[in-house]
Regions:
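Short N-terminal binding/cap micro-motifs at the start of the first secondary-structure element
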Residues: 11-15, 134
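Short beta-strand-to-loop acidic/aromatic patch adjacent to the donor-nucleotide binding site
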Residues: 99-109
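Active-site glycine-centered loops adjacent to acidic/histidine catalytic or metal-binding residues
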Residues: 9, 107, 212
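Short alpha-helical oligomerization interface
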Residues: 19-24
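Conserved core of the sugar-phosphate nucleotidyltransferase
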Residues: 110-185
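Short beta-strand/turn micro-motifs composed of small residues
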Residues: 7, 51, 105, 126-127
């Protein structure tokens, strides 16, 4: 099993929380977020962690805490300003992707056990509660339509939040899309290229997002 964790961005929505640390190193209790992510997968999992902003801290931490785990660390040189973004970050990992994989955002934590089990087809992990189309990418699902949306400039409560975790089956197509990206949509560009009726939309019971000050505060009780 391969899991890719992009962790290059500056975490601007967290303000002072990320002044000195990458947001994946923010602690919930005694444990950094990145450990909660890594520990949610089987020990034999292979990880690719893509660093940039304050990446030295991540690299040192992972080598100290997980000396026997299969973790490939890639550093990107551009993580803020023009030209930066998730698609650029992912483009630096393409030569190491040679199998289907899980994409796992570095600000997403699940408490659902073995959420990765029996995933064989393209999958987006969704959450039903507190939909916010202005803060999150969402999926519209009804009897007539299935559609993936980026953040919108209006609020809809009848869509489902995309948690930032997905399983990408056709890794060759993904690599081609990211290599030739025109719009900086990251992994969403892959899912939006698919027939939505062929995507597995899996609902997560417990999702904690630490990507903003408000959602981080809710996750601190986890």
């Amino acid at each position: 099993m391969l899991v890719i964790i992009p962790s290059a961005g500056i975490g601007s929505r967290l303000d002072l929380h990320t002044k000195y640390f990458n947001k994946s190193m923010i602690q919930l209790g005694d444990t950094p977020v990145i450990s909660k992510i890594i520990d949610s997968y089987p020990k034999q999992t292979r990880f690719i962690v893509i660093t940039g902003y304050q990446g030295v801290h991540i690299k040192e931490y992972l080598r100290l805490v997980y000396p026997k785990r299969n973790i490939k660390i890639i550093n990107v040189d551009l993580f803020e300003g023009p030209g930066s973004g998730l698609s650029y970050t992912l483009s630096k990992s393409l030569k190491f992707i040679n199998e289907p994989f899980f994409f796992h955002a570095n600000d997403t934590i699940f408490t659902d056990k073995k959420f990765y089990s029996n995933i064989k087809k393209d999958t987006m992990f969704l959450h039903k509660a507190n939909c916010d189309t202005m803060k999150f990418a969402t999926v519209e699902i009804n009897k007539i339509n299935k559609k993936i949306h980026n953040k919108l400039n209006y609020l809809r409560k009848d869509f489902f939040n995309y948690t930032g975790v997905g399983f990408i089956k056709d890794f060759k197509k993904f690599k081609k899309l990211i290599k030739n990206y025109k719009v900086n949509e990251g992994e969403l560009s892959y899912f939006k290229s698919l027939d939505p009726n062929k995507i597995n939309f899996k609902f997560i019971k417990n999702w904690f997002d630490i990507g903003s000050k408000e959602t981080k505060e809710k996750a601190e009780d986890f």
